């Protein structure tokens, strides 16, 4: 699901669904029927500091919640939601408070398994200068692991692999009896990284 055509998704194994974001839940519903796992990576990206808080909340909370709601109605048991390091609905900073609210909204939907993925600086995308990708790892030793930079492909690998593991456990009757929420920061995502292959799709 995307708001515009993405050339990188041109693959016979991928079905791209372009939707009107303001009618997201309605337009996504037919495509969500029968899904097992939903992965959401909504984010404001570059320029968020210049945006009104109302617009930021629409992108960070309203749209992801609508997406997740459609997936839940369609039958999804597992939701992987990208949030951010430091997310806290009680934070004094608008951004982290908004991301914390996103997490709360996701929890309220009560998926059988909810994975909240909290990356810090995401490398390999147009919003992060390439120089940052070189400099950030040099300082990893001096900062808590939760704030380590992560390549977008490693983040995607972690979201997919952990979600598949969670769904398999549920399908085999080994999952939790009640809805489970797991927060995954850098250390929890690291086992799914591919060393020396961060630029591979």
Explain the meaning of each model-derived region.
Residues 1, 17, 39, 80, ...:
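Hydrophobic/aromatic beta-strand patches that form the interior of the parallel beta-sheet core
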Residues 4-5, 11-12, 35, 88-200:
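Oxidoreductase cofactor-interface core, primarily capturing Rossmann-like NAD(P)-dependent enzymes
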Residues 44, 50-103, 108-109, 114-117:
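Conserved Rossmann-fold NAD(P)-dependent oxidoreductase catalytic core, especially the SDR/UDP-sugar
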């Amino acid at each position: 699901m995307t708001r515009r055509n993405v050339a990188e998704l041109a693959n016979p194994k991928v079905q791209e669904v372009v939707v009107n974001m303001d009618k997201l839940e309605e337009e996504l519903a037919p495509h969500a029927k029968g899904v097992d796992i939903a992965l959401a990576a909504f984010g404001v990206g570059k320029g968020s500091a210049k945006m009104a808080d109302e617009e930021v909340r629409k992108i960070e909370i309203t749209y992801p919640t609508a997406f997740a709601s459609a997936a839940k109605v369609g039958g999804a048991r597992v939701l992987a939601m990208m949030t951010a390091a430091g997310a806290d609905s009680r934070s004094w900073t608008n951004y982290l408070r908004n991301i914390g609210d996103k997490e709360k909204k996701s929890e309220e939907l009560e998926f059988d398994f909810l994975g909240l993925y909290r990356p810090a600086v995401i490398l390999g995308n147009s919003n992060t200068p390439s120089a940052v990708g070189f400099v950030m790892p040099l300082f990893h030793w001096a900062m808590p692991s939760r704030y380590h930079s992560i390549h977008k492909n490693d983040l995607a690998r972690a979201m997919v692999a952990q979600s598949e593991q969670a769904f398999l456990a549920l399908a085999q009757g080994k999952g939790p009896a009640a809805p489970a929420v797991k927060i995954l920061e850098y250390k929890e995502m690291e086992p799914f990284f591919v060393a020396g292959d961060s630029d591979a799709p």
